[in-house]
Amino acid sequence: MFELLALNAAILIVLVLIQWAISVKINDVSFIDAFWGAGMGILAVASWLHVGGGPGDLATLIMLMTAAWGFRLGIYLFLRWRKKGEDKRYKMILKKDREAGRFAQAALTRVWLMQAVLLFMVSSPAQVGILASVAPAPITPLAWAGFGLWCVGVFFEWVGDWQLTRFKADPANHGKVLDTGLWRYTRHPNYFGDFAAWWGIWIACAAAGWGYAAATVIGPLFLSFTLTKWSGVTLLEKGLDKTKGDKYADYKRRTSAFFPMPPRN
């Protein structure tokens, strides 16, 4: 398995270097967000294609779960980048390096390679679960439980993103706070969806063996930390507090930050 994981890592590095070269050419790394999901989908498909002895049903289930989640997110974020242009987060991260003429080096070391390491780590349950599920590995009740949690996750993420896109597309909503639909029950249904989807994939990985699950639990744990404490809820709400003011403060008072809950009066 280690040789196949190394092969996945090599595939990832090649893809990252190609995209880094493109980002230097266009002077913008923002499309890396689209590769976060798509890259995980690619690694899942690559793992499935080189399962020694052929993939079992469990491997196919994990691959499809990861690919569906990853490619949908990748397309969504790529289209958003094409519409909005360079992301201000990356503009700030690379501002000094760009002014000093070190954009190419900083884009590689501070953005692309760091993201590649995190991508590989977060997607480790999918990669290992697939590679460990050699035919005729069946889909067990535990795997179906993981699939059920994944379904909850993708519902919240996909519907949440759709509702937010529709809300922002209406000029009448400028300056307003989305507090209907799934956004009535959690301030971040898309982030919660990511959380649930990847814990579902990890549970499906556990169906291949609890040893594999223990070895890869760092993936969903790190993603959970990222979504709730690092670059997800915490970072986004700092900006929303400034731009939305009292409207967002009232929304925060009424609405659960992460896990879906009935709104408070």
Model-derived features: positions:
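A general boundary/transition motif marking the beginning of the first structured unit of a protein
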Residues: W81-R82, Q105, T109, T228, ...
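Short, N-terminal intrinsically disordered low-complexity segments that are rich in Pro/Gly
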Residues: E3-N8, A21-F31
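Juxtamembrane helix-capping/reentrant segments at transmembrane boundaries
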Residues: I26-G41, G85-R110, K176-W183
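C-terminal ends of transmembrane helices
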Residues: L17-D28, I75-R80
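Hydrophobic transmembrane alpha-helices
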Residues: E3-V16, G39-L73, L77, L119-Q163, ...
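Short linear sequence motifs
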Residues: V24, V29, W69, K83, ...
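Active-site pocket-lining segments that scaffold enzyme catalytic pockets across diverse folds
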Residues: V111-L118
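Membrane-helix interface linkers and caps
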Residues: K25, V45-T60, F78-D97
